[in-house]
């Protein structure tokens, strides 16, 4: 399935150039067995409305244009991460589609929930309807479905996960808590609320590192920069 729509805009500022350089750094490979290919999984967090989906759409598009195999996964109940890539059209979510398939007595396949546009593979985990369930539990269920579909065997260079960062919930913190990603990128701005969320994410990474986790914070992407330098000062203070 390839929905119609225009190309997403491309950001060319120095901040994105630095971000691409960070993302290109290969993590330490496991030594248990010979590795022929290693997928780098990057989770992106930030407060609602800060521009995570916009940032990821452009980042994934540019990576694909450089010849990388990229999978973009929306991990927000709003299910709007991939809409920019598909011209404003919403992709069927994993949770919704798996429920329909189960009721029909059919098996869920990767072709039901994974779509491609401009070289980027994309999917949405989805979530429950408002007032009808737990968004964090929906994320956990979505990843359980990905496991059944062989998520870790897919041949991608990068997997980008778009997470909501406003809530303190185990489901939304899954990549950090379970070492599902190698790096975390925080999208923020110079306002106090976005930096508060950024600090919470950094604190979560630090907490799980003390418990033996290996996830690191790659950096802070400053969106809607008003020139005050608050986000830059925060990034320097947390290292």
Language model regions located:
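Short strand-loop junctions, especially beta-strand C-caps/beta-turns
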Residues: 47, 125-128, 189
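Charged, alpha-helix-enriched surfaces in structured cytosolic catalytic cores
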Residues: 54, 76, 80, 134-137, ...
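Short beta-strand/turn micro-motifs at beta-sheet edges
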Residues: 30-31, 109-112, 171-175
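Nucleotide-state-sensitive switch-loop elements of NTP-binding domains
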Residues: 38-42, 65-69, 75-163, 167, ...
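Predominant activation on well-ordered alpha-helical scaffold segments within soluble catalytic domains
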Residues: 57-60, 140-143, 147, 199-202
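Conserved catalytic-core segment of NTP-binding enzymes
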Residues: 17, 65, 148-158, 163-239
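Extreme N-terminal, non-catalytic leader segments
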Residues: 2-50, 54-71, 107
């Amino acid at each position: 399935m390839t929905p119609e729509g225009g190309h997403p805009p491309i950001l060319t500022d120095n901040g994105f150039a630095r971000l691409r350089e960070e993302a290109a750094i290969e993590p330490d490979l496991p030594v248990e067995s010979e590795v022929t290919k290693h997928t780098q999984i990057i989770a992106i967090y930030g407060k609602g409305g800060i521009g995570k989906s916009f940032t990821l759409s452009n980042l994934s598009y540019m990576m694909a244009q450089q010849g990388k195999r990229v999978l973009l996964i929306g991990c927000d109940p709003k299910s709007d991460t991939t809409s920019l890539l598909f011209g404003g059209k919403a992709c069927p979510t994993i949770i919704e589609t798996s429920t329909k398939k189960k009721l029909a007595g059919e098996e869920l396949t990767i072709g039901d929930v994974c779509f491609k546009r401009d070289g980027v593979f994309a999917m949405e985990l989805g979530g429950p309807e408002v007032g009808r369930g737990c968004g964090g539990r929906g994320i956990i269920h979505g990843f359980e479905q990905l496991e059944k579909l062989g998520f870790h065997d897919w041949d991608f260079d990068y997997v980008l996960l778009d997470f909501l960062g406003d809530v303190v919930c185990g489901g939304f913190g899954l990549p950090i808590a379970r070492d599902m990603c190698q790096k975390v990128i925080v999208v923020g701005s110079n306002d106090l609320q976005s930096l508060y969320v950024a600090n919470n994410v950094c604190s979560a990474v630090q907490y799980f590192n003390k418990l033996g986790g290996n996830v690191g914070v790659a950096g802070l992407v400053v969106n809607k920069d008003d020139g005050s330098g608050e986000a830059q000062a925060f990034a320097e203070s947390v290292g």
